[in-house]
Amino acid sequence: FLLNRSSDLLCGFNVSNLNIPNFIQSWEENISVSYPDRIASSLDIMIDGPLGASSYNNEFGRPCLSGYFRTFEKKIADNSYFGYHKPVMIAGGLGAIDNTNYKKNEIKDNDLIIVLGGPSMLVGLGGGAASSKQSSKENEELDFASVQRENAEMQRRCQEVIDKCSNSLKNIIISIHDVGAGGLSNAIPEIVNDCQMGAIIDIDKIPCADKTLSPLEIWCNESQERYVLAIKPKHLDIFEKICLSENCPFSVIGYATDDKLLVLKDDSESYIELPMDLLFGEKGKQQIKVNSSAIRETSADYSGFNFHDCLIKVLSLPAVASKQFLITIGDRSVGGLTVQDQFIGPWQVPIADCAITANDFSFKDGEVMSMGEKASIAIINPIASGEMAVCEAILNLCSSPVGNIAKIALSANWMSSFDNDFDKYNLFKTAESVTSNICNKLGVTIPVGKDSLSMKMSWAEGNKEINVKSPNTLIVSAFASVHNLKNIIKPMFVNEKDSSIIFVDLADGKKRTGGSALSQVLQIDDLECPKVENILKFKSFFEETQNLINSKKILSYHDKSDGGLITTLIESAFAGHVGIDIYYNQDIFGLRKNFDSERDQYIKFFFNEELGVVMQISNKFLTEVQKLYSEIGIKTYVIAKLNSEYEVTIYDSRDKPFYNTSLEALHKIWHRTSYEIQKIRDNSKTSESE
């Protein structure tokens, strides 16, 4: 079996409100931000964007098994909004690499520089660079020029060449670099600078699909499915044979030199002749002086809202609702190594916390990946948003037998408008806190990441200028190896009567609802948002949970996230197709013994999005499990039991039901948003029958 291979993929979306025709939600009606003619609407993006991702996955032959989808829009002031008119569309994946190949080797004098893959085209010119420019009417032409084109077939050919080289007894590739932002103008200098070398490049040797391209366009375009790599001259014949066997284009475009000079030339003239130090020399740190102030934290009053109305709205919010329309368009089993995709249980409910694949066809060990993001919190407290995103990603994969938390590796993608000193300050402090306060204390690493610091769009509308910028957004992807795939726990209640459902509180009893799905759908300015209360206690929880997984004492596991505790419980009931009785004990949650005021607390308790987990435990292990968590300072509460009807009932502290409804009815509401998009995108009759 291949030692070096790509495995599975992930895909995520942040967009502004969808405003689906004939299905416009109450929280969308009062925020009506238009779009300039040059950009697609959020609904158009969510109809066409996922099709692009899934078709590429299908053509390339890798399953997309994980992701997220968030819509967000909020008015800041007149003509100024938070939102994702400049959307976040994140794609990534997981792979395995043998320990003989993970380090790049030293490029030496006269080693060949090769471009592998497709030709240069006048597409994506300034693409990655343009993503770091604020969008406005003045650069509308660049907006269109920045659009890149995909070619999954070419990518697969490149992958086969790389696989053959990396899985041979001796890898003839010395060093390799994918061509991304900046095109060859970035990839070539970087690959030689890593080895303190220079390079002489013949621009005429760079493959071009369009012979009219200028030297600048050849050098800077960001045509996809290309790699820059270095090999020894003596290995050129072998490399050529591999490329011919895979029908993959390549060209020797130059060679490395000792003189640390970058030269781009043709037979008649030199276009670039620069010392490498000029490109990569140390720059002084930018100093920004900001008069910061303490974040004003004031909670909102939810006592006047009806519980059922809140639940209906929250279940309809895209961040909470079913993501089925994003999933069924892709092949999730290609390659034959998928262990867990987005769908859970025999009823195939899309609520998976993580994606899991096997290493090989023995299906003994494998890999897990998950995602975490809390962008809606960032408009209140960017630092808390970053910390919560990391912890959410880790909680999402905690249901897999990972073992030591230090085995988890994170990827961080940072998005910000970065257009004022406060945004810069908040981004800096968030990055500082995520690394020093969270990752260092957990013992996990963030070896990779990306950023886009231009998440703002402005345009003229009549005599007004409209501005839409994104919150400071951190998207965290978590990856780890899994040992013993038979021990993975699913977010699905098992129909075992002699069991209890416990809530594991990782927020020390806090019930802050700022930045929650609830505050978004009710359009409430709630300035008290969730935070990571005790990161060392969080680490202890992870370690203890891993022990319980290995000893097979957990029946189901689902972390509390968008929508809060109530949606966590309901989703697990959907997947298991079982009913649940939920118990609200006044003493446990430290409320006043006043039955009239008790119901005012229900909404905050059930809809807050503090860190927490719901587990189903067999009653024979219940006391032991609660004791183990108690010993590390974590409180757990028996929150629910299974019932014989497919319905949810919530009991107050007097054991009187105050809420009861059919889970089938809630499931239809939860699925409605996905259905409405499918109805527009796909055959409407097929969507209706489904």
Predicted regions and their residues:
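Glycine/proline-enriched, intrinsically flexible loops and inter-domain linkers
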Residues: 1, 5-690
